Amino acid sequence: MARNCSVRRPVSPPVPETPRRYVQSGQPEGVPALELTGERTLPDVPEENYWFRRHLAVYEWIAARVDGMRVADLACGEGYGSDVLADRAAEVVGIDANPEAHDHAKARYVRPNLRFERDLVENVAGPFDAIVFLQTIEHIEDVPALLGAIATAAPLAFISTPNRLTLAPEGAEKSDNPWHLREYTIAEYRAVLEPAFGSVEIHGLFHAGKLAVHARAIGLGWDRIHSLLRITKPFYDRFTPAISASDFVLRPAGEADLDEALDFVAVCRE
């Protein structure tokens, strides 16, 4: 979570001998629930709602830009993002290598213009009109090779990653997320993307709405206050599930300092 401006995961009671498992609730009949592992975000897990809405906001922003297109959603995970894209795109193919995520997505998100394939993202092959590849480049070992494959498969790609400066502890090379091989600053992100594409336009994701108010409260000492009042868990147990995608906003580089962004969202063209 971004330091100084982030919503914390709710503080839990003393850790029991067996760590708590977070599993999706309320799944439709016949749809296997997924367990939260940290590799991907999930809907229907109240404690995960901040991260889910943070990802959902970007999918909604991209969906408005792929009207009528044939789209591949690489590393689609649970499938919710592919479903959002299918609201506007002519056809969406959600691709993920994880068998549990693939089975879940195929069972839960059913519509004529949406299908799911189980495969490695490195095997992407077009032609597509656009490729969506969100919050996964930091998991990839051979990034240049994958970006080359994406650039070959589609003339347009939306690629996002967290900002290391607001995710990792100050001065650290990366956060403690064990799935991340490398995290990027804005300069590092540009440097890895630009050789693969003709043009790269990067937007930053920032807090808005309730989260912007929360960030200001943190700056005024809210962390100390809720701790002193012993209301940390009750407050965040209510606040975190109330977060929505509208509590995030995307801004282009010319309108915001991307060093302060939560995530970078690159629009890459051939």
Set out the residue ranges of the language-model regions.
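Conserved N-terminal segment of class I S-adenosyl-L-methionine
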Residues: 2-126, 130, 134, 144-147, ...
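Short alpha-helix
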Residues: 181-197
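Residues lining the SAM
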Residues: 134-137, 160
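Conserved S-adenosyl-L-methionine
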Residues: 198-209
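C-terminal helical/coil "lid" or tail adjacent to the Rossmann-like core of SAM-dependent
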Residues: 213-246
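A short glycine-rich, Lys/Arg-flanked "PGG" loop and its adjoining helix->strand segment in the class I
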Residues: 144-157
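Short, glycine-/aromatic-enriched active-site segment of Class I SAM-dependent methyltransferases
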Residues: 159-182
